[in-house]
Curated annotation (Swiss-Prot):
Domain HTH lysR-type: residue ranges: 1-58
MF GO annotations: DNA binding; DNA-binding transcription factor activity
Alphabetic keyword roster: DNA-binding, Repressor, Transcription, Transcription regulation
InterPro entries (UniProt xref): LTTR, LysR_subst-bd, Tscrpt_reg_HTH_HdfR, Tscrpt_reg_HTH_LysR, WH-like_DNA-bd_sf, WH_DNA-bd_sf
NCBIfam families: PRK03601.1
Domain of life: Bacteria
Function: Negatively regulates the transcription of the flagellar master operon flhDC by binding to the upstream region of the operon.
Official protein name in the record: HTH-type transcriptional regulator HdfR
GO biological process: negative regulation of DNA-templated transcription
C-alpha cells in the first residue's frame, strides 16, 4: 500500500477538511480527494461521509485509523534508522536556484573553509522548488531548507538569517518599466502576491524562471527587466536599475525539523553568516 495514501487519510481525519489537509500536505485539494478515492478503491469501502463541509469518518474509517497510525509510525521509524546509517556524515541543504546562485554558493564555500569542527562532513547542495523541499524536509530526506518564507508547520524550527535587498534591473541605463518586458524570477508566493503593484496589474511576464543567472542573461536579448539582489547585480556588472522602480527587502530563513537528530550541527553551521555577501 502507498504510504502517501495513508498519510493523506490521516491528515483528512485530523483536520476533517480537504482544503486544510491539502494545505498541510502542500497538495491541491483535488490531489487530496484523488488519494482518498484511491485508498477507498483499494479497500473497497468508503472512509469518509461528506455532507457539504461536514466530513466524518465512517465505521470503516474509524477501524482503519489506528492501523494507519501504527503503519505510518513504523514506516517513519524504519526510514529514520536506514537514513541514519547511510547519511551519518552527509548534510543536505536545499534552496531555490536563485538563492544558490546569488548568495548560498558563497556560504557553502565558507562552510568548507570552517570544517575543522566537522571534519569529514559531506555536503549536498540541493536545488528544487520550495514546495518540493518542504516535503523532503518533512520526510527527513533533507536536513536544512533556506527560503524567503517563514515555516507554516508546527514541527519545524526556524531562524531568521537576515534580509537582502531586491531591485528591478535591466541591461541599459535610463529605462522605464513601460519600455521593458517583464521577466519573472521566482522569489516565493508571498512576493508574487505584491508583484502586480510593483510592476503593473496588466503586466504579463514573457519568461518565468527560478534561475537568476538565466534571467540576467536573457534581459538584454528580450529587452527585459527582473528583480535581482542588489549586491549580486553590482558584482555582475552591466546591469542598471529601472528608473521608475523601487527597492524592497526580503527575509531569509533557515528551516529544519524540530526533532532532527542534527539540531546541534545545524545551529553550529548557522553561526557562519549566510548573508555576509548580501545586504
Amino acid at each position: 500500500m502507498d504510504t502517501e495514501l495513508l498519510k493523506t487519510f490521516l491528515e483528512v481525519s485530523r483536520t476533517r477538511h480537504f482544503g486544510r489537509a491539502a494545505e498541510s500536505l502542500y497538495l491541491t485539494q483535488s490531489a487530496v480527494s484523488f488519494r482518498i478515492r484511491q485508498l477507498e478503491n483499494q479497500l473497497g469501502v468508503n472512509l469518509f461521509t461528506r455532507h457539504r463541509n461536514n466530513i466524518r469518518l465512517t465505521a470503516a474509517g474509524e477501524k482503519l485509523l489506528p492501523y494507519a497510525e501504527m503503519l505510518m509510525s513504523t514506516w517513519q521509524a524504519a526510514r529514520k534508522e536506514v537514513a541514519h546509517t547511510s547519511r551519518h556524515n552527509e548534510f543536505s541543504i536545499g534552496a531555490s536556484a536563485s538563492l544558490w546562485e546569488c548568495m548560498l554558493n558563497q556560504w557553502l564555500g565558507r562552510l568548507y573553509q570552517n570544517q575543522d569542527a566537522h571534519t569529514g562532513l559531506q555536503f549536498e547542495a540541493r536545488i528544487a522548488q520550495r514546495q518540493s523541499l518542504v516535503k523532503q524536509l518533512h520526510e527527513r530526506q533533507l536536513d536544512l531548507l533556506i527560503t524567503t518564507e517563514a515555516p507554516k508547520m508546527d514541527e519545524f524550527s526556524s531562524q531568521l538569517l537576515g534580509y537582502f535587498t531586491l531591485a528591478l534591473y535591466t541591461s541599459a541605463p535610463s529605462k522605464l518599466k513601460g519600455d521593458l518586458n517583464y521577466l519573472r524570477l521566482e522569489w516565493g508566493p508571498d512576493f508574487q502576491q505584491h508583484e502586480a503593484g510593483l510592476i503593473g496589474a496588466d503586466e504579463v511576464p514573457i519568461l518565468t524562471t527560478s534561475s537568476a543567472e538565466l534571467a540576467q542573461q536573457q534581459i538584454a536579448m528580450l529587452n527585459g527587466c527582473t528583480w535581482l539582489p542588489v549586491s549580486w547585480a553590482r558584482k555582475k556588472g552591466g546591469l542598471h536599475t529601472v528608473v521608475d522602480s523601487t527597492t524592497l527587502s526580503r527575509p531569509l530563513y533557515a528551516i529544519w525539523l524540530q526533532n532532527s537528530d542534527k539540531n546541534a550541527l545545524i545551529r553550529d553551521l548557522l553561526k557562519i553568516n549566510v548573508l555576509d555577501e548580501v545586504y
